[in-house]
């Protein structure tokens, strides 16, 4: 009954605490059904008290800022029908069914739609989450972060950033032609095929980069696109975890701003986990290496798995959380499963399972 009709849009576009709202009875009923509102009795006359707290709980479970304000994003999520959420859970379980058991004592897992990374440790047969933080992933429209797994092998302090050719041609070169001063401002340098730094800024060097005869590299420093630490798990797509000079973006609800690599909110905490088997690498030493301004790479004694995953339904502390299907992978998987089921039904066969890259 709580979903027989959609919640109406607030009169001013946003429902603020203390305001009146025609949809309060339906909102209360819906939040009770979802388990976010535990109060009994008649709905309040105004949007206040326990109802605001229930909306905050709902927002927290759906990747939204828990401010209690019912704006466009919160209203959209509140109007999602239960059958859609059930399907999200089914798709999450389907993906989990494919996931191999990792024979490792440690692992890092990034969940793209959740914009979160978690680091796990296995002790005495029990899995313990040691670190969890927000991340920024690849832009959904242009540069999606791929789904894969690899082994963490290196940590690079004060890294150089070698501007990928696609970014150089599509973004960096056009800007440098418009704003030559941007070259020194960002700490760029030209590097030849032999790895040597080639002079300063010149139009000839820009043309050489365009032809693929040179590359642009950003020196370590405060403006470096990778921040002051990079976590390397070699893979064909050259995806890695790294810090960022623009931490303010972590305040956003939706965080798909990168060119594909994954930016981490708390690099020191992640470094402490990654280097836990290196007793000489204390937090103080990590911070010093990050601030040194001179690139240095450390090879890990024991590589361990890094999994870049994709699921829009997650259980945290016994509560289900849902996230938008930012890359459309749920829709692709849903369509594939339904088509397969229809095909098997038509042929009289029983479905055993299906695996997909989504």
Model regions and ranges:
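Well-ordered beta-sheet/strand-loop patches within structured domains
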Residues: 1-358
């Amino acid at each position: 009954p709580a979903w027989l009709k959609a919640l109406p849009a607030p009169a001013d576009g946003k429902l603020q605490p203390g305001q009146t709202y025609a949809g309060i009875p339906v909102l209360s009923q819906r939040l009770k059904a979802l388990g976010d509102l535990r109060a009994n009795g008649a709905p309040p006359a105004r949007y206040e008290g326990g109802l605001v707290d229930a909306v905050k709980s709902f927002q927290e479970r759906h990747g939204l800022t828990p401010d209690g304000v019912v704006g466009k994003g919160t209203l959209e999520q509140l109007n999602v029908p239960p059958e859609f959420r059930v399907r999200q859970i089914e798709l999450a379980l389907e993906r989990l069914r494919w996931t191999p058991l990792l024979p490792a004592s440690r692992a890092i897992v990034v969940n793209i739609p959740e914009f979160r990374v978690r680091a796990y440790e296995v002790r005495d047969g029990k899995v313990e989450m040691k670190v969890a933080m927000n991340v920024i992933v690849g832009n959904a429209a242009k540069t999606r972060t791929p789904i894969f797994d690899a082994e963490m092998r290196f940590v690079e302090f004060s890294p150089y950033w070698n501007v990928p050719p696609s970014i150089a041609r599509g973004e960096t070169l056009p800007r440098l032609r418009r704003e030559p001063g941007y070259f020194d401002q960002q700490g760029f340098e030209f590097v030849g095929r032999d790895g040597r730094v080639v002079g300063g800024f010149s139009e000839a060097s820009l043309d050489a980069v365009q032809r693929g005869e040179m590359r642009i590299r950003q020196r370590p420093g405060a403006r470096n696109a990778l921040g002051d630490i990079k976590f390397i798990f070699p893979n064909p797509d050259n995806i890695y975890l790294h810090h960022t000079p623009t931490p303010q973006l972590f305040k956003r609800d939706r965080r798909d701003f990168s060119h594909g690599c994954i930016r981490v909110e708390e690099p020191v905490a992640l470094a402490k986990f990654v280097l836990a088997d290196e007793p000489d690498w204390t937090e103080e030493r990590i911070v010093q290496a990050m601030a040194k301004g001179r690139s240095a790479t450390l090879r890990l004694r024991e590589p361990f798995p890094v999994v870049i995953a994709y699921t829009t339904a997650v259980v945290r502390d016994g509560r289900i959380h849902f996230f938008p299907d930012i890359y459309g992978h749920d829709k692709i998987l849903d369509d594939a499963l339904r088509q397969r089921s229809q095909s098997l039904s038509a042929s009289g066969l029983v479905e055993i399972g299906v695996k997909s890259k989504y």
